[in-house]
UniProtKB/Swiss-Prot annotation:
<keyword id="KW-0145">Chemotaxis</keyword>
<dbReference type="InterPro" id="IPR011324">
    <property type="entry name" value="Cytotoxic_necrot_fac-like_cat"/>
</dbReference>
<dbReference type="InterPro" id="IPR005659">
    <property type="entry name" value="Chemorcpt_Glu_NH3ase_CheD"/>
</dbReference>
<protein>
    <recommendedName>
        <fullName>Probable chemoreceptor glutamine deamidase CheD</fullName>
        <ecNumber>3.5.1.44</ecNumber>
    </recommendedName>
</protein>
<comment type="similarity">
    <text>Belongs to the CheD family.</text>
</comment>
<dbReference type="GO" id="GO:0006935">
    <property type="term" value="P:chemotaxis"/>
</dbReference>
<keyword id="KW-0378">Hydrolase</keyword>
<comment type="function">
    <text>Probably deamidates glutamine residues to glutamate on methyl-accepting chemotaxis receptors (MCPs), playing an important role in chemotaxis.</text>
</comment>
<dbReference type="InterPro" id="IPR038592">
    <property type="entry name" value="CheD-like_sf"/>
</dbReference>
<dbReference type="GO" id="GO:0050568">
    <property type="term" value="F:protein-glutamine glutaminase activity"/>
</dbReference>
<dbReference type="Pfam" id="PF03975">
    <property type="entry name" value="CheD"/>
</dbReference>
Length: 165
């Protein structure tokens, strides 16, 4: 039996795979792992989003995969270019944890995880891509792996608990 190939997505990266290849990203704390897929075509794209808005970039060229407001649409385009059908696309999300406690005076700026999740969902809604499952928030880091053949997203938390959505 042949081993299934796994493509790794690094921080602020996005990639697309076709089954039987699976796609994985590690180290999701406040970052969000976004999977956009077409189950009928057994293909999926994943982005490892770090921050909510590209307006936070400091000059130069913006890495689209790094920011929720640019990554979702760019990932959607990659999935369609690989053969995905816009009307059939669905999304799954994981991450967006609040990894550290801050005093209430730090306000909204320190809610990076929650703001990442909110912006990813806003962009998916704008593109009419339904979120069919999610495992977001909390205080634990996650590693996720998506199998485009089965449509299952496996989530391993820092405590080694594994969940499938």
């Amino acid at each position: 039996m042949r081993a299934i190939e796994t493509v790794k997505v690094g921080i602020a990266e996005m990639k697309v795979v076709v089954a039987p290849t699976v796609i994985r990203t590690c180290g999701l704390g406040s970052c969000v792992g976004v999977v956009i897929y077409d189950s009928g075509k057994a293909l999926a794209g994943m982005a490892h989003v770090m921050l909510p808005h590209s307006s936070m970039a400091r000059g130069g060229v913006v890495n689209e995969a790094k920011y929720a407001d640019t990554a979702v649409e760019a990932l959607c385009k990659l999935v369609i270019a690989a053969g995905g059908r816009k009307a059939m696309l669905k999304a799954k999300l994981a991450g967006g944890a609040q990894m550290f406690s801050f005093s209430s005076t730090s306000g909204d700026m320190m809610r990076i995880g929650a703001r990442n999740v909110e912006e990813v969902k806003r962009q998916l809604e704008r593109l009419h891509i339904p979120v069919v499952a999610e495992d977001v928030g909390g205080h634990s880091g996650r590693t996720i792996e998506f199998n485009p053949q089965t449509g299952m997203l496996s989530i391993r938390t820092a405590s080694q608990e594994i969940k499938e959505i």
